[in-house]
């Protein structure tokens, strides 16, 4: 059953809204996945804050106009599942990459982050990007390191003085 013009406009608006608020997107060939497997993938994606959409490529191309995922439009061929990261950069890539390891029928085709298009070989690299919380903790540890080092150095001065006085005392007693 073909979609009416009104239904197509609704789909384009919906995908466009998701794309406008997403950090990254992954397009994967899902041909060969069974319904139960696709349902499992949707559940895993929902838990990780990833939005999955299966739409016609022409509608997706229209939805991507004016977004950072416009770069994907020329490379979209065949039946594709679109996964959008709404919480952090790597969540969609992580979900698709992990699921593709178990189910060979799911084949990542395109990855887009920040207006840059990457091939399927880059999905693992994007999947390994830290989550927002991990990135913040790394940043805080980096910022905290010089302060901690300074505190240790300042604490060491009196300790070194005490050890020097003790060494002089021991030397005088020995003489």
Curated annotation (Swiss-Prot):
Spell out the Pfam families in the cross-references. Answer: Ribosomal_L10
> Which keywords belong to this entry?
Ribonucleoprotein, Ribosomal protein, RNA-binding, rRNA-binding
Asked whether the UniProt record includes Ribosomal protein among its keywords, one would answer yes
What GO cellular component is one of the record's annotations? ribonucleoprotein complex
**Keyword RNA-binding annotated:** yes
**Official protein name in the record:** Large ribosomal subunit protein uL10
MF terms (GO), sorted A to Z: large ribosomal subunit rRNA binding
Sequence similarity: Belongs to the universal ribosomal protein uL10 family.
* Classification lineage: Bacteria, Pseudomonadati, Pseudomonadota, Gammaproteobacteria, Moraxellales
> Per the UniProt entry, what is one GO biological process?
translation
The record describes its quaternary structure and partners as: Part of the ribosomal stalk of the 50S ribosomal subunit. The N-terminus interacts with L11 and the large rRNA to form the base of the stalk. The C-terminus forms an elongated spine to which L12 dimers bind in a sequential fashion forming a multimeric L10(L12)X complex.
Note the Gene3D superfamilies from the entry.
3.30.70.1730, 6.10.250.2350
The entry's function note states: Forms part of the ribosomal stalk, playing a central role in the interaction of the ribosome with GTP-bound translation factors.
């Amino acid at each position: 059953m073909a979609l009416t013009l009104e239904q197509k406009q609704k789909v384009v608006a919906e995908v466009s809204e998701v794309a406008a608020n997403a950090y990254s997107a992954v397009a994967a060939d899902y041909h060969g996945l069974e319904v139960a497997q696709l349902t499992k993938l949707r559940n895993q994606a929902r838990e990780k804050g990833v939005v999955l959409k299966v739409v016609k490529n022409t509608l997706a191309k229209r939805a991507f106009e004016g977004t950072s995922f416009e770069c994907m439009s020329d490379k979209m061929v065949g039946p594709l599942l679109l996964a959008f990261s709404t919480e952090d950069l790597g969540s969609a890539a992580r979900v698709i990459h992990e699921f593709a390891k178990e189910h060979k029928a799911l084949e990542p085709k395109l990855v887009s982050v920040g207006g840059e298009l990457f091939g399927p070989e880059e999905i693992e690299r994007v999947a390994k990007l830290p989550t927002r919380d991990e990135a913040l903790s790394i940043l805080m540890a980096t910022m905290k390191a010089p302060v901690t080092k300074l505190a240790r150095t300042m604490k060491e001065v009196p300790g070194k003085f005490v050890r020097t006085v003790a060494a002089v005392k021991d030397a005088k007693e020995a003489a």
